[in-house]
């Protein structure tokens, strides 16, 4: 690929990122804040774990030991949203890393983008006909998020629409239509 082609791809992705940030800026800020709070609570729980281990060793044999309580990490829809995005990112990263050479070779064959464009059309047809569901972050399982991450990883093939693939995967997993679109675009940021 030429430098001009690479520059075009980078600028295209930057433009998409700017558009996503403009549309979902309130959600992105809230997700960022909740992500920081998740890290804080994990560190507090780790400190409580160390303290409780020390207390259990020190106070072995006593009838009552005053253990430190643990904080619940995923205690809101936005925190669940953050964790779901992280779960979706794992298979995407693995597929992207492992399949890098396959994607590069597939880009050189005209038949692959052609087949993938047809696959995109079929996926968009399915998404249009799919009733979807009513799942919001609190109802979505981590398995659902993992499957959507796999769909995003597969969508690195040339000609396969990333958003079309992930929105279809979301709808087939029972996501609410509006949330499926939001999830698809926000999960493209990391």
Identify the role of each PLM range.
Residues 1-190:
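Multi-pass membrane proteins that catalyze or facilitate reactions on polyprenyl-/lipid-phosphate substrates
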């Amino acid at each position: 690929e030429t430098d001009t082609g690479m520059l075009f791809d980078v600028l295209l992705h930057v433009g998409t990122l700017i558009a996503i940030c403009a549309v979902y800026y309130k959600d992105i800020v809230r997700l960022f804040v909740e992500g920081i709070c998740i890290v804080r609570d994990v560190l507090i729980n780790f400190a409580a774990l160390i303290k409780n281990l020390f207390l259990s060793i020190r106070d072995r044999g006593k009838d009552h030991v005053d253990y430190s309580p643990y904080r619940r990490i995923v205690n809101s829809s936005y925190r669940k949203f953050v964790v779901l995005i992280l779960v979706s990112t794992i298979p995407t990263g693995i597929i992207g890393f492992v399949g890098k050479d396959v994607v590069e070779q597939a880009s050189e064959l005209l038949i692959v983008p052609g087949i993938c464009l047809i696959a995109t059309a079929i996926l968009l047809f399915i998404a249009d006909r799919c009733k979807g569901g009513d799942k919001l972050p609190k109802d979505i399982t981590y398995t659902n998020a993992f499957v959507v991450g796999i769909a995003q990883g597969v969508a690195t093939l040339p000609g396969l629409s990333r958003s079309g693939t992930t929105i279809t995967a979301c709808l087939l997993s029972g996501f609410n239509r509006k949330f499926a679109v939001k999830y698809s675009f926000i999960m493209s940021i990391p």
